[in-house]
Amino acid sequence: MIVTTTPSVEGHQIATYHGIVTGEAILGANVIRDLFAGITDFIGGRSGAYEKELGRARETALSEMEQAARAKGANAVVGVDLDYEVINNMLMVSASGTAVTIA
């Protein structure tokens, strides 16, 4: 499946629009507290453990979005946007885009 932040896929024509698809992942309060407690793991001002957890959350959100697109019969997602938001000491990563079939 092609997943892109652009509104189209170069060299392909969009044949069908299937609508908006989303995926979310939430890191709970314990994960965030543990990550901040592990600040001793800083290397060059960056926390490897925190970045790893964010990466996992991002991949989960993107994977859920792709599954939603497949369920609608799409073979690509265009206009993808990733958002990060803190809600009640939890970090939510959400991915959204438009499911399409490209020729």
From Swiss-Prot:
Disulfide bonds: none
Stated family: Belongs to the UPF0145 family.
Name this protein carries in UniProt: UPF0145 protein Rsph17025_2361
Species: Cereibacter sphaeroides (strain ATCC 17025 / ATH 2.4.3) (Rhodobacter sphaeroides)
Classification of source organism: Bacteria, Pseudomonadati, Pseudomonadota, Alphaproteobacteria, Rhodobacterales
